[in-house]
Structures are given as structure tokens and as C-alpha cells.
Amino acid sequence: ARALSRIADPAALELLKKSLADEDAEVVAWSAYGLGYGCKGNEAATVRALVGRAATLSVTKIDRSGPLDWGASFADALGRCGNAEAEATLRAWLDIDDKSEAAALALGRMASRRKRLDDASIVALLDAASRPDKPVASALLAFTRIDAGSDMIKARLFNVANDALSDSAGARRSFAVRALGRVGDAAVPALSKVLREPSFTVTERSDAARELARIGEAGQVELRKSLAAFVPKPETRATLKGAELAPLRVVLDSLALPIRDAKPALDEIASIELPKGDPAFARRLIGLRCRAASLLAGEGITQPKLVACDPDPEGVAGRLALLEVLARGKLTGTRFTRFKELVESKAPLVRQAALEQLGSHPEVAEPESILAKALRAPDAGTVATAAQVIASYPDRAAERRTRTTATEAVDGSTPAPEPIKPHASIVDALTTAFTLQRAPDSTEVWTALTDAAGALQILSFKPKLDAFCKSPNPALRQHAEKALRVMGEQKRECKAEGPAPRPSELDHLVSDKVTLVFETDSGEVKLSLDPALAPVAVTRFVDLARSGFFEKVRVHRVVPGFVVQLGDPGGDGYGGAGKAPLACETSPISFDPLSVGVALAGRDTGSSQLFVTLAAFPHLDGDYALIGRAEPGWERIAQGDVVQRVRVLPP
């Protein structure tokens, strides 16, 4: 049932319907999970099968011992199907003690996917979240993913979430903080309290800053007021070597112009003295200095603190801050000259960030020349970024770009846009990009190039897209199908014509749990990988750790309060170990705080990047392979930290 649930094709789904009747709880759980994963297009029949089997399980004695909760698997499957009957069933389960928590989680995931819930479900979730005897901890999850709606619902959500702030740290309190931003101005005092009080966790305080930013101007007023409390004094500055960096960084990132009364605090932060002999700590402080300087500068690219924030003239933090400032105005004249330097930078992170600005700056001269050069870049991330820009803004790659604002025809109607004629340099660069040999785990580059070819409707690339359409990789097939339909084959359906290559890891699968100890710039952190969850992926990461792959690799992504991610030698998130992509060994097990997962750029695209969640994020459940659990301490890690050494236990 586990294997069938991960295949989830029509033949597998028929077998899963049969195994749903099994008497083994684990088989039933995997069967329900697989049916939910393959529910699209067959929602009504699948929901009926799930609801019927759940009803019989409720009155029969089935052994519930084991690693999986069949009730949670059924709820998750119904949430994935997401039709009216599924939602009504989950709503009813909120009133059943042994199903309420799973039902709330499933409704939260449904809200994340659909961006809405029925009014009856919203009321039922608020009822469940506010039960005086035993509130359902996950009932507020849905409100972290959708807007609250009417003023009456907002008022009730505020009362429920505000009450939850008095709980001890846990899922209910965490979801309450994230839900308060949907309430609006009335939530500002409560969020301010969370942000300022050290009794709340670093994750909750970081979330509070983000939710204040979501609220708008009232939230910005509070962020500006709060900033002064976060300015590190010389005697307490060392706390920024650890987790206390996160709330300050999120406050800075959440602030928007104009800065008004935040200027004195920003001046202090932009002027923090850098330590000598501690480059890792200095890097953290440079990031703070440059973000503060960017806010102080507004549109002024010669602002003294902006110029001085990064002592390395080629430093990434300083150049990214300059790019932020440049992007606030038109990229013409001197500003364009500086932009051109950044968009041709040898630092991939800087170059990619500059390329992304082309979409919002139609005034940039000759964008097709910039994009063509980027498509020929030596690093995969820059190639993929350029292709993604073309896919989203195909006129930037055209011989003659269409006007950004349509003019009315004589009869008052809006004329259809002119067909885009790709610039010859773009066609040449894409041709080269498509013909290069790339590492087996370069799926993200291939899908980006496919999207670009489709957006520009370059018919000469159809043979390449036809090949992708038959690929065993589902991400390649999905993007190829979309591109081919844009090119005129509206009914094209892509199907694999052969199996994926056999993973080499199958020849030496890890059989027992393994602990990885990462020695980083921010200290030692640990995680435990469990092959029972995802045997092939766990074996891959253990092999990489033993080979020394992770040593000297930077932590390329940190979202405070959300995730820490590493495993790309290039440091921009586009690279891997050069091995065949991993099939998604997903499961019904939840991403709780300190869960370890395989990073993806689409189904079956994992390679060597892993992430650690810093709080509960159930919307990840079932879409990412969960491969283990981490020990506390990962909240200390900062973006840019280097893994100096990795130990594997047992050796």
C-alpha cells in the first residue's frame, strides 16, 4: 500500500480502493493517503469510498498501534479531495473527540490549497478552537492561510486567538499568532505584545512581526515603534550570535517606507561596529547594517550608510541592499549603469536578484540582451532565473515589446496584444541552453527553460518538449504539457513512456536511524534520519554526509520561524549533488517543529537539499518527504553560516 500510494496512477488507485478494506491499520492508513493523493478528477467516488470505510472502522475493533494514525490519513485524504461532501464530513468530525484534531488539520490544509472554506466550516472551526474544556489545538490553522471574511468573523477570531496567547507554547498558540494578522488593526496591540515579550518563543515573535506587516499601516506604525527595543546595546550584542537575531531581522525585513520615526533606530543599526576576528558574527551584523541602510536610503544610491554597510566592495549583502534601493526608482541614467553592474555580477545571488527586477522595470533598455547573456551563464541558477523571467514577462525577450498599457480601438474595445516575436539573441541563447549537457538533478533548469519556450511559442523547441512530455519525471511532464498547449496543442496530455532510473541507493539501503552532527559557524546542531519514513532519501543523505559533501557548504536559506535549508554547493538553492533526482517518498506524517524534509522544486526533484522546520507547518504534509527529526538548536542558524564538518553516528 505504501508503494501504491506513491505511484497513485489509475491502476494503483484501483488497488488502493481494495486495500482500504484491509484489517491492518497501517495498510488502511497508507491506502487512504494514496487515494487522497490521486483524488483529482475522481473526487466524488473517492470521497464516498473514504467516508464509507471510515464509518465501518468507527464501529469495528482494529488495532491502532503502529507509526501511522489511520484516522489522520482519512482526514488528510478528504482534505485533498476537497469537494463539498469531503468538507462537510470533516466539519462533522470536528465534534468527534478522536477525529477532531485530524479534521481541523485537514480543513487547514484544504484552506491552504483552495484559499477558502465554506462559512459553515469557518464557524465550526472557531467553535472547536474556543471549547472551554478542550479546545482543538489545530482549529486555528485554517485562519493562518485564508482571510477571515466579515467583521463579525474577524471579531470572533480575534477573541479566540487572543485567548490562545495565554496558553503555554505549542501549536495552538503558534497558530493563534499567525492568525491574528488576518484580523486587521484590532490585532495590533496583541501582536505587539508577542513581538516585545521574551516569554514568547523566537518563532512566535518573528511571526508577530510578519503579521504586523500584513495588517498594513497600523502594523507599520507599531513596527517602527518596536524597532528601538531591538537595537542591540554593546553589552548585549553577543546575543545576536544566536536565535535573538531572528526577531530583529524580521522586523527590519517587515518595515516599509517611509521610515518616519524609525530613523534613529535604523541609524544605530546601520552603524553597528563590526567585530574583529569573528567573520561569521560580522556577516550577521553586516546583513543587519545593510538592511537598515537600505531603508534609510530610500531611493538614494549614494547614501553614506548604504555605501559603507558592507566593508567588502564585492560583498553580497551590500550589493543586494544597493539593488533594493535601485529598484525603488526608475532604472535609467546612472541608476541603470549601477543596475547593469549588478545584473552582470559574478555572484549568482546578486545577478539572479537583479534579473528578477526586469519584470517590474519595463524602462530597462535592451532587456533581451541582458537575458540572453544570463541564459549563457555558467551557473544553473542564473540560467533558470533568466528563463523564469522570460516565462513571466515574454515581452522582455521580444524583438519589439508590446506596450505595457493597452490602448482602445476605434470601437472602444481593447485590442488583442500583438503576437510576441522573440529576439534572435534569445532564440540563440535558449537553443544553446537546451542543447547543453546538465547534471541529472537539473530538473528546475529544464522546467524553467520549458516555460520560457512555451511563453515565447518557439516551435523549433517542440521536439525537446515532446521528449520531456514522455519523461518519467512528473515535473518535466507537467511543464512540457503546459508549454505544448500554449503552442497550440490544447488537448495534449503528457504520459511517461518508461520507468524512472533505478536508484543506486537501493543496493545499500540504510536500515537503522542515523544521526548527523553538523558543526557550523553557529555551533553544533543535530538531526536524526529515519529510514522507516523514506529509505531511499535517507540513504542518499547519509551517503552524502559520509562522503564529506556538506562540508564547506553554506546554509543558503533561512526564514526565521519557518525553515533552515542547506545542501546546495553553489549557495543559491538551484544546485545539488549531481545525482538522479529522488522520487518523493511522502507520507501522512505531519511536519511538526524540528521536522526534517527533502527540499523540492516540483514532484520528484529532490537531490541533496534538506530543510528543518522551526515550527509546525501542516501545509507541507504529504507534499514533501519527511525523513527525520532535528534536535533543538537549529533556530540559532543564520543564512550564510558554513558547515565546517559533519559527523555520522554511528560511524
Regions found by a protein language model. Give the residues of each.
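Short, intrinsically disordered, charge-balanced linker/junction segments flanking boundaries
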Residues: 1-3, 127-128, 628-629, 635-636
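Amphipathic alpha-helical scaffolding segments comprising HEAT/armadillo-like alpha-solenoid repeats
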Residues: 9-21, 40-61, 83-95, 113-129, ...
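Single, functionally critical "micro-switch" positions that shape active/binding sites
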Residues: 23, 168, 346, 378, ...
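Alpha-helix N-cap/helix-start capping motif
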Residues: 25, 348, 380, 631-634
